[in-house]
Amino acid sequence: MGSPPAGLLRRFHRAHPKTELDVVTLFDADAAIAAVYTRTIDATFRAVTRPARLLPGGIEAARVLDEPVQLLTGPAHEFAGARAVTPAQLVGHRIWMPGIVPDTEWAAYYAGLAAAFGLAIDRTGPNFGTEPLLETIAGSPELATFVGEQTHIVWPAEYDLRRLAVRDPTPVYPHSLVWCSDNSHPALGTLRDYLASARPSRRDASTWAPAWAQRWVEVSG
């Protein structure tokens, strides 16, 4: 499964091939932000749920990518033949996401999404990874799951899974770049300029994001 921030970095590197990148994965948001603060890393991509006053001094953030959320179903699901669904249509349907870990950014995001639209997002059950989840969704007429539009997933052809757009409004997952304001690494400045030029210039009522994500729309260093 490929992540949207990884895709952003690949596009950045194609545009700036002489810029050296050392990419690491840090699961925990607090650990990643602490690593930025101590200069262990220069920046991190996160969905920033905390207000600025609760971030370490000198830490800044800017929302750089809004990733639309899609519905993934099997061929026997009620919505399998649709091209798009609305959040209102999903009320009463079980959306299974056993990979959600409590106290993480994506847990906060999907809790907010469920509360905003009255959705039944179920994180119970053992999480055996992506492949077993896809296999279960493929064989179920009732279960569906959410995936990011830019999240690359490969499955066997016989699963016949369907990716449906969610509209009116479209939930978007807000990825932000987090960095330290006094970090003068030249590649960091180049990356920030690139992301600022590439990010969407307008967000309107056709999309939805949690209230905490709005804090980072115009924040920059």
Language model: regions and residue ranges:
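N-terminal winged-helix
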Residues: 1-34, 45-46
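Secondary-structure junction motif
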Residues: 4-11, 52, 93-117, 206-209
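Residue-level signal for nonpolar/aromatic packing positions in well-ordered secondary structure
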Residues: 12, 36, 71, 89-90, ...
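C-terminal effector-binding regulatory domain of bacterial HTH transcription factors
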Residues: 14-18, 150-159, 168-221
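Hydrophobic hinge/microswitch elements
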Residues: 28-33, 37-41, 99-162
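Ligand-binding clamshell of periplasmic/extracellular solute-binding protein-like
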Residues: 29-37, 48-62, 79-80
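Beta-alpha-beta core module
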Residues: 54-62, 67, 131-183
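Flexible hinge/capping segments at coil-to-helix
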Residues: 59-69, 73-95
